[in-house]
């Protein structure tokens, strides 16, 4: 399978016209990681943006007095290290391959330069990034609801004052 085939099969790039995917292919590298490998470490710089092509990656956060806590499992089509795409290469979690993993990696700085120079590429990339971040935020909200589900019934969630626009 060619690099273009691997890249174009990624959900992140599926909506992008083939000519634009070909522009990204010039930057893309296929990376493979054996099970148990740390792709990047929380607090460390990592310059590359990844799209998972095969396998699953666990994202952990270090919690004081508790150690590394799994927060999410990423699979095919999911993005990793998106901070590198927006100009902040310091990772907010640690990524560990749960099985053999293949990613399509893009160096963050050249990818940002391409997005800035070619606005159509930038539009597609940033639209997909926003969509992926929205899904990640929803997953986090659902985890928080699940975490606190036992405590919600014990709390009085009725506000002391009404919301703006509520009838008096």
What do the predicted segments below correspond to?
Residues 1-168:
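Cytosolic regulatory regions built on CNB/CRP/Popeye-like sensor folds
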